[in-house]
Amino acid sequence: MKRPVTGKDLMIVNMGPHHPSMHGVLRLIVTLDGEDVVDCEPILGYLHRGMEKIAENRAIIQYLPYVTRWDYLATMFTEAITVNGPEQLGNIQIPKRASYIRVIMLELSRIASHLLWLGPFMADIGAQTPFFYIFREREFVYDLFEAATGMRMMHNFFRIGGIAADLPYGWIDKCLDFCDYFLTEVVEYQKLITRNPIFLERVEGVGIIDGEEAINWGLSGPMLRASGIPWDLRKVDRYESYDEFEWEIQWQKQGDSLARYLVRLSEMTESIKIIQQALEGLPGGPYENLESRGFDRKRNPEWNDFEYRFISKKPSPTFELSKQELYVRVEAPKGELGIFLIGDQSGFPWRWKIRPPGFINLQILPELVKRMKLADIMTILGSIDIIMGEVDR
């Protein structure tokens, strides 16, 4: 029997779009020399839904349910950016109570997002046990969301001028109990994961990005802070009420996958500190600025017509976006989430450009995986933390 000759040519492998470690419908065309990665080409667009064009044909209140489908694991941030832009264009003041509740919801959403990053990331590198512990804690966060907004995901809770509803009776005590419980669980994660020699072997020194490289690639969020750059928009822009709370920016110097893990784990602890301060200092007063519902045009008797009121062929009168442009951003769990908004003195935006953090952070993936092993692709991709809903929009 003649033994087959071993091939020495490069091999091209498709990873995804239907792959359990792709975190959505991402396709990677990987060129391999044995186990070594020679080249990697990401193919995007499988989840493109035209979110920017949809925004140009919707009033802000109509568009709010759409934005929760960008990053569907951290929907409070997409809602926040959607209302912050029109609020700044219209110079609308937010009641202090509404601002505090927004901060609480944003930080709970950050914890939920980081938890749902950590569980699959550990599963990607072969650790199944933490996955189940992490989903247990995430369920408590979703219970809080459901009690306050009526929905576990896709909350549709933020409004121009405030929020949709006040916190229900007993919610604050329930949230404080969760904060005390969760701090003990983070310590358990550190015992279970951080000192594990197999985990350290998979992540330490893998996917290193130095500070200058991170800035040149336009990285943001934990990707940037893990490379030695302590940059956080909550400190820089001081939006909402973040400047009224005491907390520290979490950052690391190593720039590898381990550093990105440590940054996200520490951020969850800082989020708990912010939530506890906001709950203990929660002011009274209204939860929405009702004047933001007004509009400058004189009342038109045509608005009572059948076409307006019942069959909805014409858009109802609503909040107008003034004729100016604005870039507004928030510190989302994955990085800087921003929109470039151009108003046109109408209820619809003239232009709504989304700056998704996952799309920008994903650009460095081909550079990171070159000269690495095939198994390291999952580690590096997982440490970037992407959701294809916001990458493809």
Swiss-Prot record:
BP GO annotations: photosynthesis, light reaction
Function of the protein: NDH shuttles electrons from NAD(P)H:plastoquinone, via FMN and iron-sulfur (Fe-S) centers, to quinones in the photosynthetic chain and possibly in a chloroplast respiratory chain. The immediate electron acceptor for the enzyme in this species is believed to be plastoquinone. Couples the redox reaction to proton translocation, and thus conserves the redox energy in a proton gradient.
HAMAP family in the cross-refs: NDH1_NuoD
Organism: Draba nemorosa (Woodland whitlowgrass)
GO molecular function per UniProt: NAD binding; oxidoreductase activity, acting on NAD(P)H, quinone or similar compound as acceptor; quinone binding
InterPro entries membership: NADH_Q_OxRdtase_suD (IPR001135), NADH_UbQ_OxRdtase_49kDa_CS (IPR014029), NDH1_su_D/H (IPR022885), NiFe-Hase_large (IPR029014)
EC number(s) reported in the record: 7.1.1.-
Subunit note: NDH is composed of at least 16 different subunits, 5 of which are encoded in the nucleus.
Primary localization class, coarse: plastid
Cellular component, GO, one term: chloroplast thylakoid membrane
Family assignment from sequence similarity: Belongs to the complex I 49 kDa subunit family.
Bilayer disposition of the protein: Peripheral membrane protein
Name the record gives this protein: NAD(P)H-quinone oxidoreductase subunit H, chloroplastic
Class of the enzyme per the UniProt entry, highest EC level: translocase
Location(s), subcellular: Plastid, Chloroplast thylakoid membrane
Keyword annotations of the record: Chloroplast, Membrane, NAD, NADP, Plastid, Plastoquinone, Quinone, Thylakoid, Translocase, Transport
Domain of life: Eukaryota
